[in-house]
Structure formats: structure tokens, C-alpha cells
């Protein structure tokens, strides 16, 4: 495992959390790891596909892109949002 820390803001959560993911994790896996710390704790569960983007960007990362391929820097802020 190649640990890679990111700050994550989950849609409708009031916290930004430091979450450790793996460089080989897909964006779907990253979204799941972030959701684990938010959903059913401070955010109600919801149907839909979770997506990842750079903080305050409108462009979503491809779901199968890995952290290593994303160009993100350690501790950079990402948003996890539900796809409309």
C-alpha cells in the first residue's frame, strides 16, 4: 500500500477530513473511503453515484482514474459529491 493523504469535503457535511487512501485506489474507491467517515454519522444515506473532483472544481474525475493518475498532491482538498 502506498498511503496518500487527502483532505476530503463530502457533500452536505460540515467537516473537511483528512483521509488516507492508496495511490492505486480508483476514484470510486476514494469516494467510498471518504463516505465511510461521513454517511450515517453526519450525512444521511442517499441513492446515487458518488463522484470525486478537485475542491470547488466543476470537472469530475473519471470513476476509474487512480489517485496516482489524477495529478493530486498529498493533502490536497477533494470534494465527494453525488452525480446529478
From Swiss-Prot:
SUPFAM superfamilies: TmoB-like. Inhibited by Zn(2+) and Cu(2+). GO terms for molecular function: toluene 4-monooxygenase activity. CDD domains: Ubl_TmoB. Keywords: Aromatic hydrocarbons catabolism, Monooxygenase, NAD, Oxidoreductase. Component of the toluene-4-monooxygenase multicomponent enzyme system which catalyzes the O2- and NADH-dependent hydroxylation of toluene to form p-cresol. Also able to convert benzene to phenol, catechol, and 1,2,3-trihydroxybenzene by successive hydroxylations. InterPro entries: TmoB-like_sf (IPR036713), Toluene_mOase_B (IPR009355). This is Toluene-4-monooxygenase system, hydroxylase component subunit gamma. It comes from Ectopseudomonas mendocina (Pseudomonas mendocina). Optimum pH is 6.8. It comes from the Bacteria. GO terms for biological process: toluene catabolic process. Its EC number is 1.14.13.236. Pfam families: TmoB. Belongs to the TmoB/XamoB family. Signal peptide: none annotated. It catalyses: toluene + NADH + O2 + H(+) = 4-methylphenol + NAD(+) + H2O. Disruption phenotype: Cells lacking this gene show a complete loss of toluene-4-monooxygenase activity. The alkene monooxygenase multicomponent enzyme system is composed of an electron transfer component and a monooxygenase component interacting with the effector protein TmoD. The electron transfer component is composed of a ferredoxin reductase (TmoF) and a ferredoxin (TmoC), and the monooxygenase component is formed by a heterohexamer (dimer of heterotrimers) of two alpha subunits (TmoA), two beta subunits (TmoE) and two gamma subunits (TmoB).
Amino acid at each position: 500500500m502506498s498511503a496518500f493523504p487527502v483532505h476530503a469535503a463530502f457533500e452536505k457535511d460540515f467537516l473537511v477530513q483528512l483521509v488516507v487512501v492508496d495511490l492505486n485506489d480508483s476514484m470510486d474507491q476514494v469516494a467510498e473511503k471518504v463516505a465511510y467517515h461521513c454517511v450515517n454519522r453526519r450525512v444521511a444515506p442517499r441513492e446515487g453515484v458518488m463522484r470525486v473532483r478537485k475542491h470547488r472544481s466543476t470537472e469530475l474525475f473519471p470513476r476509474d482514474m487512480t489517485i496516482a493518475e489524477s495529478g493530486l498532491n498529498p493533502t490536497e482538498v477533494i470534494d465527494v459529491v453525488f452525480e446529478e
